[in-house]
């Protein structure tokens, strides 16, 4: 049995910076890790879809995870994504995560195969046995094709390693189900435009790709809601962030936007691996305008809170 892990704060699913030839830009990845640690995020995730895991081999994903784990060791927990179409690949990633000293694994449904809930649970428990690490489930039916429903949750709950779930369904009723009927599984927000609602229902963590380039603003929302219970300030910060979430979620170029956001901070993110391509000039300009407005609005909210004597964390970069 793995040591119980508490999910609190902002967890960043890291992008993968590439050179022009498609090879890993590990220097830029190191810069990003250091920037995020300095900004105060609470954990890092390697090998998620934001990191373009679908375009990387198992060996490449393990190389990245090992690099991130070694870089962050002792400073932040590192969670390794194990999602893959083939169960043996997920097991190899889970075994690798354990061997490198990762703190936990992120475990999703194998895409495309559309397993039953019982089959999906059997798959998850096989990966659990290989990892013997804390597990954060990843429910994203829009991408995986299958919901992690009540039958699945009941079956995997036999393992005390299952400590959390990244809930990305977008269905608010799922949040109600998880918090009311599965309190032993910590619920983490995985749908950015519902972060406020997740915190209102007691979630203590948020796995958010936008924190790759706006960590301070995401931390500010978490601290206002989850730490201080100040949902008045939280609503104002959330309102300022919604235009960014609309660009990320509705534009059809989620990862491209996140990578360009990192570029705006001065860190190379590099090209996308096929089949995806980068943003055009107009799309870049539109994203940059949203970022500029968002950062100014959140800074003003935090400054007002500070002037009125309310505790508020500065939106760090």
Q: Model-derived features: where do they sit?
A:
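Catalytic cores of TIM-barrel enzymes
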Residues: 2-6, 177, 262, 317
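General structural feature for long, well-ordered alpha-helical segments within catalytic domains
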Residues: 25-28, 32, 60, 64, ...
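Active-site beta->alpha loop and helix N-cap motifs at the rims of alpha/beta catalytic domains
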Residues: 3-145, 154, 301
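Residues at alpha-helix boundaries and short interhelical turns
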Residues: 40, 72, 76, 189, ...
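Catalytic alpha/beta core domains of metabolic enzymes, predominantly
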Residues: 126-130, 141-249
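Gly/Ser/Thr-rich beta-alpha loop segments that engage phosphate groups in nucleotides
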Residues: 11, 50-53, 83-85, 166, ...
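Structured C-terminal cap/extension of enzyme domains
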Residues: 196-317
């Amino acid at each position: 049995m793995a040591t119980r892990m508490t999910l609190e704060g902002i967890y960043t699913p890291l992008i993968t910076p590439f050179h022009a030839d498609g090879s890993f830009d590990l220097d830029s990845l190191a810069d990003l890790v250091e920037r995020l640690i300095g900004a105060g995020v609470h954990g890092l995730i390697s090998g998620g879809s934001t990191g373009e895991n679908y375009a990387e081999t198992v060996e490449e994903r393990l190389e990245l995870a090992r690099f991130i784990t070694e870089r962050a060791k002792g400073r932040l927990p590192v969670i390794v994504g194990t999602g893959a179409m083939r169960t043996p690949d997920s097991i190899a990633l889970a075994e690798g995560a354990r061997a490198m000293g990762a703190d936990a694994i992120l475990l999703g449904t194998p895409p495309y195969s559309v397993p039953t809930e019982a089959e999906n649970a059997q798959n998850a428990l096989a990966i659990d046995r290989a990892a013997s690490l804390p597990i954060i489930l990843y429910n994203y039916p829009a991408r995986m094709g299958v919901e992690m429903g009540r039958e699945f949750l009941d079956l995997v709950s036999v393992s005390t390693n299952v400590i959390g779930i990244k809930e990305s369904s977008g269905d608010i009723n799922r949040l109600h189900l998880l918090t009311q009927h599965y309190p032993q599984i910590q619920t983490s927000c995985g749908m950015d435009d519902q972060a406020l609602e997740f915190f209102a229902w007691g979630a203590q963590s948020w796995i958010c790709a936008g924190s790759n380039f706006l960590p301070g603003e995401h931390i500010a929302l978490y601290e206002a809601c989850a730490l201080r219970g100040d949902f008045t300030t939280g609503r104002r910060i959330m309102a300022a962030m919604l235009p960014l979430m609309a660009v990320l979620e509705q534009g059809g170029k989620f990862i491209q936007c996140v990578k360009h956001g990192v570029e705006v901070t001065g860190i190379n993110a590099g090209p996308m691996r096929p089949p995806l391509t980068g943003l055009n000039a107009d799309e870049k300009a539109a994203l940059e305008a949203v970022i500029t407005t968002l950062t100014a609005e959140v800074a003003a909210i935090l400054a007002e809170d500070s002037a009125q004597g309310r505790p508020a964390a500065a939106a760090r970069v």
